[in-house]
Amino acid sequence: MIDQMRVFDRALVARRRARAVASVDQVAPILEDAADRLLDRLDDTTRRFTRALDLGGRGFVAPKLAARGIPFVVSADLAPGMAARGGGLAVAADEEFLPFAEGAFDLIVASLSLHWVNDLPGALIQLRRALAPDGLLLASLPGLPTLGGLRNALAEAESTLRGGLAPRISPFPELRDGAGLLQRAGFALPVADAEEIALRYKSAFGIFADLRAAGEANAVLARDGRIPPRALFPMAAARLGDGAIDLSLRLLVLTG
């Protein structure tokens, strides 16, 4: 039986992030947009930050923090090569077991990097401890209904082909969960809001390619380990219709 606290295969997540070092620039426009939207929150404060942690930014966050005049920026990632993309001090670190001292940073930014964590409240507690008492956390995760159409198309195709379902897309939180997660982790002024990034693909296969390029392929422990039926993805693509496919990436933004 799978431990209820272990939803994701972290070793597989690490391997996929390591492989994605060579391909992640394929999705640079999406990750740049997500990072910019998250860092826009810094414009709402007059606070000057001096010690920042970029957690899982894949090379798209650390340079933006440095450009804002923050003198000390650490990039941390489960994959050493991905951390090195930040261009500065790089640390290989597991989001579930952070190696940083209490109060080490006055700013922590986690852009689309916490959704493969098994114990999200526990990870947020560790992030709070790594913050100085007056520090700021900015985090974003994909939230529902991100990839809802793709999820439904895959489920319908698999049900048709195999008569049952296997989880093929990571479970995402809802906006209503956000502030509660921060509150449970001990953040005094938790705020959760959402933003939408509109995406358009020529076909469903472009979606699959971008997910792989970003290291975001299925890592759910309960996934079906068998090779998918050859017809699965073409059938799912057909259910999404012909022509361009419009999707929305919903960013659940946590500020604490």
Language-model segment annotations:
Residues 1-47:
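Class I SAM-dependent methyltransferase Rossmann-like catalytic core
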Residues 23, 27, 188-256:
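Conserved Class I S-adenosyl-L-methionine
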Residues 40-101, 107, 121-125:
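Class I SAM-dependent methyltransferase SAM/SAH-binding core
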Residues 47, 118, 132:
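Short conserved AdoMet
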Residues 50, 104, 131-135:
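Surface-exposed loop/turn positions
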Residues 112-116:
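Short catalytic micro-motifs in class I SAM-dependent methyltransferases
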Residues 121-136:
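A short glycine-rich, Lys/Arg-flanked "PGG" loop and its adjoining helix->strand segment in the class I
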Residues 138-202, 217-223:
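Conserved catalytic/acceptor-binding region of the Class I
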